[in-house]
Amino acid sequence: MILVLDFGSQYTQLIARRLRERGIYTEIVPFFESIENIQKKAPKGLILSGGPASVYAKDAYKPSGKIFDLNVPILGICYGMQYLVDFFGGVVVGANEQEFGKAVLEITQNSVIFEGVKIKSLVWMSHMDKVIELPKGFTTLAKSPNSPHCAIENGKIFGLQFHPEVVQSEEGGKILENFALLVCGCEKTWGMQHFAQREIARLKEKIANAKVLCAVSGGVDSTVVATLLHRAIKDNLIAVFVDHGLLRKNEKERVQAMFKDLKIPLNTIDAKEVFLSKLKGVSEPELKRKIIGETFIEVFEKEAKKHHLKGKIEFLAQGTLYPDVIESVSVKGPSKVIKTHHNVGGLPEWMDFKLIEPLRELFKDEVRLLGKELGVSQDFLMRHPFPGPGLAVRILGEISESKIKRLQEADFIFIEELKKANLYDKVWQAFCVLLNVNSVGVMGDNRTYENAICLRAVNASDGMTASFSFLEHSFLEKVSNRITNEVSGINRVVYDITSKPPGTIEWE
């Protein structure tokens, strides 16, 4: 295993993802993790991530110096390299010419870490400081136009001023793999087939004959959780799907068909009337979310109680992912937690269930691979993200059944046309937003005053940042024509060309 010490870089999770893609199990912990906990994990190597601080600042992030007593190879990336230089007596200063974006890396000396790597390649830079003097015993391995010491080495300690984990670094994945395999002696043992076998065995042992309650949303995470649990405990899984009336067109039927194919019993609750009555007259986005969250818990509790009376439920399953676990601990210290993640928060006290989180070691892309391994259809696994509150946050203003129907039909047309044009898998997320704006139009000889709808399509890797998708005008024209002709109550279609930032992907 490789252990990454996180110093607050926006790219830290990418380090683990790049190594895992290559079959090398990798975990992330905050830089202040105790040496005792690090020793317990028994890593074969450490990677020190980048970060926003400067090593010469008073409040610079610094791990325990005892990491150097572990006698394992260490790789410092960006800030991590600067920390190594500073710790061993070199000099780091603010750079006159800061480096952000692509740069050409030129290898000047052979090293095991550059085995099979091109002499010159593009790398991704993101730093305001630079090393001007190496510590005693260190050697320069590579340079860039503005960084004379772009890669350094001293025995089994390495430093890279660039970010090998970012896709723009052409040879970055190979460099990380060389460190893990050739320097640390790791083996390629990580993969979803191995994970599935191990996790099913673990779940069987932990749950035994107890019952597990699992809320199914129709999304990828909850579907994969339910599938994995069913493989382990069969009919002791109680899967509950709440239809709140704010789903995409034909969503309920699609989820039911999927679970039927997977041979997993599904308890479907039709709660449309309950949700819509509570949302009546509400237009404020956060209040919508709050009402939907609270109502979901009420409906879920009622259903859980029915099953609880039939036979005691001992566990509650959640689709917590590894990024949720990482983000629950801030690099600023235990007292400054970024956020605590609960997929189903605010459950009543009588639901004193033990929590079970089968996916807590996995990234989103790994969840999809696991789903494929478990037999979930590829078409289902590659669906675009869908918000928990559903179409409620895609209808601006007050919600009504007629507005839901209007949005469902328009959204269905947009997605259908994306698939026909082989564009669906090329955009990260696409959907329609029903605006609380009416506009004047003309249909035949008649004046209309109807809803406007907005098409939204973005490209992203993880949703943290996103750029709007460049869709051909002819494609947009086709979608617009279909919506205005086929969906009653819509006479205008617009396309959102806002990126994130400054906008968010969803409108509410």
Swiss-Prot record:
The active site is at C78 (nucleophile), H163, E165. One of its GO terms (molecular function) is GMP synthase activity. Pathway: Purine metabolism; GMP biosynthesis; GMP from XMP (L-Gln route): step 1/1. It is an enzyme of class 6 (ligase). Keywords: ATP-binding, Glutamine amidotransferase, GMP biosynthesis, Ligase, Nucleotide-binding, Purine biosynthesis. Residues 1-189 form the Glutamine amidotransferase type-1 domain. It catalyses: XMP + L-glutamine + ATP + H2O = GMP + L-glutamate + AMP + diphosphate + 2 H(+). Its EC number is 6.3.5.2. GO terms for biological process: GMP biosynthetic process. One of its GO terms (cellular component) is cytosol. Signal peptide: none annotated. Residues 190-383 form the GMPS ATP-PPase domain. ATP binds at S217, G218, G219, V220, D221, S222, T223. Pfam families: GATase, GMP_synt_C, NAD_synthase. SUPFAM superfamilies: Adenine nucleotide alpha hydrolases-like (SSF52402), Class I glutamine amidotransferase-like (SSF52317), GMP synthetase C-terminal dimerisation domain (SSF54810). Homodimer. Catalyzes the synthesis of GMP from XMP. PANTHER family: GMP SYNTHASE [GLUTAMINE-HYDROLYZING] (PTHR11922:SF2), GMP SYNTHASE-RELATED (PTHR11922). This is GMP synthase [glutamine-hydrolyzing].
